[in-house]
Amino acid sequence: MSFYKLLRNNIFQLALVPGNLQNRAAGYLIRGPKNILIETGASPSNSTILSTLKTLEISPEAIDAIIVTHIHLDHAGGAGLLMQQCPRATLLVHPRGRKHLSDPAKLIDGAKQVYQDDFDRLFDPILPIPEERIQTISDGDTLDLGGGRQLQFYEAFGHARHHIIAFDSESRGIFSGDIAGVFHDRIHDRTGQPISFPNTAPTQFDPEEMNASYDLMMSLQRQCFFY
């Protein structure tokens, strides 16, 4: 069974939950002079990421950077484990998320309170990342991917107060994390178009900030979204 598919411009979509590539969380690999992973999912997705890298003949040692749009566990819970396996990689995250990736104790405690007996199955292990391997990214920062290609980062709050998006200069696509909503390709509106619902996470949902993030994304000369 394949856990990835090539989308465009050497961007691969990775299944972060085995067997649910089209209907569940996704991560992305940008393959090129620099190999970049965007989103890690929770640690149980680790084996499918490594399997995909092996199939594509990319060594974990060849991963240059791992980017998380925000630190919610379905997007970044497996970052510590994957960083151990990608020894050359730098982890990129918004400044407000840095301390929780270097010391995830609060993330673990909060998840255990919510998921209780299901915590181990869904998220274990959540491992700390050495501070020296974490680089913070803020509004307007860029990452050179080589060959004239770059990612530009923007703060996009509303779902979380540390959420960023990345705009790819080559594909003209936005890696949107959760701020563009939850995409349902099997649910359609009256015109037959797929529907995306706002992702209103508890505690940090801010409708005004989310609307501002929508305006930001609409202002970019984008051709597609990578949910």
Language model: regions and residue ranges:
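Conserved beta-strand hairpin/beta-sheet module of binuclear metal-dependent hydrolase folds
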Residues: 2-56, 166-176
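Metallo-beta-lactamase
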Residues: 6, 42, 62-74, 99-157, 161-226
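Structural motif
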Residues: 36, 62-65, 171-173, 224
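Active-site environment of divalent metal-dependent phosphoester hydrolases
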Residues: 45, 71-76, 99-100, 161-163, ...
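Metal-dependent catalytic neighborhoods of phosphoester/phosphodiester hydrolases
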Residues: 77-86, 104
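Short internal beta-strands
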Residues: 90-96
